[in-house]
Amino acid sequence: ECKKLFGGCTTSSECCAHLGCKQKWPFYCAWDWSF
């Protein structure tokens, strides 16, 4: 199960499609600008 937008994460691979884990605090899945 992937992490949704604003879900806590440690790596981008945990996040759902089009989301990436933020590089700096706070660490959560944010939109990576892709469609």
Swiss-Prot record:
Stored InterPro entries: Huwentoxin-1
Keyword tags: Disulfide bond, Ion channel impairing toxin, Knottin, Secreted, Toxin
Disulfide topology: 2-16, 9-21, 15-29
Tissue-specific expression: Expressed by the venom gland.
Main location: secreted
A molecular function (GO) term: ion channel inhibitor activity
Gene Ontology CC terms: extracellular region
Cell location: Secreted
Domain notes: The presence of a 'disulfide through disulfide knot' structurally defines this protein as a knottin.
Family: Belongs to the neurotoxin 10 (Hwtx-1) family. 48 (Jztx-F5) subfamily.
Main function: Probable ion channel inhibitor.
Protein name per UniProt: Jingzhaotoxin F5-21.66
Organism of this sequence: Chilobrachys guangxiensis
Species classification: Eukaryota, Metazoa, Ecdysozoa, Arthropoda, Chelicerata
